[in-house]
Amino acid sequence: MIKQRTLKTSVSTVGVGLHKGEKVQVTLRPAPANTGIVFRRVDLDPVVDIKASPEAVGETTLCTCLVNEQQVKVSTVEHLLSAVAGLGIDNLIIDVDSAEIPIMDGSALPFVYLIQSVGIETLNAPKRFLRIKKPIRVEEGDKWAELLPYEGFRVNFSIEFEHPVIEKTCQTMSMDFSSCSFIKEISRARTFGFMKDIEFLRSHNLALGGSLENAIVLDNYRMLNKNELRYDDEFVKHKILDAIGDLYMGSASILGELNAFKSGHGLNNLLLREVFKRTDSWEWVTYEGDKTSPIEYQEVNATAF
């Protein structure tokens, strides 16, 4: 039987929030089977839990933000969720003492390391996969995203940026996660932004925690970071990283093929909402006996790089 996963013990880290620029502490805690992924605002009295779900997603302009009926928010959740998804974690309580998850280095790698530091515990309950049975597609102008039936998880993603640095890189990427490693191939890809947009955001008291230490920053012609790209195709790989996190709002790995063109947080969420709305287009599946997982989850103690 392929079993559900959580952490062996709790683990904490501290970082800076992207938009407020304030210090934030996050603690990942083990959770029982069938809990899902729950964000807990421990800075509030009483504490407030917000379970990751497609319907809980509110603002998606600059990041993915969860919000409840009382307008309590937790923003910038996508990189942490991407790490959780990439390591196949089904159940987790995430304590956070702010309205945003720290940006860390702009990728999912610090959260992967955090989980690796304590290890993964298997639970005596079958792991549930969301298997796509029929094509599901959403569009927004020239942007689109779709999920097709596939016995595994495959991603075909394209971006289109008219910038001399990005145009020199591959803007289309195909990856099959039945064989490739999320940790090695995706987790290190950093978020990126343009100087003109950052200046506008800061004039509105946003992106106050953004820096060359946690993002790839581009002016009109070049990359301002001194260090080279972590991947030759880091820009499109970060968009895949985001999509993996956004599509994990259902606290379950998807069995299907994701095809996307210029998709972002909003369209990713719209696609997942459409999936849950069209109940005839998907089903829950578990794997009993000696069957192996259709998605490759990196063993946390293995050498990933």
From Swiss-Prot:
The keyword Metal-binding applies. Pathway: Glycolipid biosynthesis; lipid IV(A) biosynthesis; lipid IV(A) from (3R)-3-hydroxytetradecanoyl-[acyl-carrier-protein] and UDP-N-acetyl-alpha-D-glucosamine: step 2/6. One of its GO terms (biological process) is lipid A biosynthetic process. Disulfide bonds: none annotated. Its EC number is 3.5.1.108. The active site is at 265 (proton donor). SUPFAM superfamilies: Ribosomal protein S5 domain 2-like. Its cofactor is Zn(2+). Belongs to the LpxC family. This is UDP-3-O-acyl-N-acetylglucosamine deacetylase.
